[in-house]
């Protein structure tokens, strides 16, 4: 059984869920300008270092360059990314993992409002903590700590 071309109808979501539950992995593709493809490689290397690449390939088919806002496109199992947003590989990798968690929740039929964003942000923080522990690069460790501090800041007293 092939992964559905789109994940929109009840039947398509059911098919996607069955496949992911049985270990299906996408051949992740990056679509965009050569500059975009090159810039996406950095966060993907970090995702591989942290051991999250299979998680990404389970739920996301494509990372596509767009001119607008970066976002998850559930019906395409795609992350749309603006090349101008690709300035911090650790933050970008966290964004990709956060959107992957949202796609997982969508396929599993979990509510994608209310608590979904909390789950996705927790997954992002978990990823950054894991990357910090698994990398041997002191510069990446330092940036992970800075990124974690940013995510753990309390905006209100």
Region spans (language model):
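Stable alpha-helical elements in mature extracytoplasmic
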Residues: 39-43, 92, 96, 116, ...
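Short, low-complexity, Pro/Ser/Thr/Gly-rich segments in the mature regions of secreted, periplasmic
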Residues: 146-156
């Amino acid at each position: 059984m092939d992964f559905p071309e789109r994940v929109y109808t009840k039947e398509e979501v059911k098919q996607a869920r069955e496949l992911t539950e049985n270990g299906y992995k996408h051949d992740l593709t990056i679509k965009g300008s050569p500059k975009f493809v090159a810039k996406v490689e950095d966060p993907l290397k970090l995702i591989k270092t942290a051991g999250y690449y299979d998680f990404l390939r389970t739920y996301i088919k494509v990372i596509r360059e767009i001119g607008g806002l970066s976002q998850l496109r559930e019906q395409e199992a795609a992350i749309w990314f603006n090349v101008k947003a690709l300035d911090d590989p650790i933050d970008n990798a966290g964004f990709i993992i956060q959107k992957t968690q949202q796609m997982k929740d969508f396929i599993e039929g979990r509510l994608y409002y209310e608590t979904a964003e909390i789950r996705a942000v927790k997954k992002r923080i978990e990823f950054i903590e894991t990357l910090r522990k698994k990398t041997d690069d002191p510069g990446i460790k330092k940036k992970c700590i800075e990124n974690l501090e940013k995510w753990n800041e309390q905006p209100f007293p």
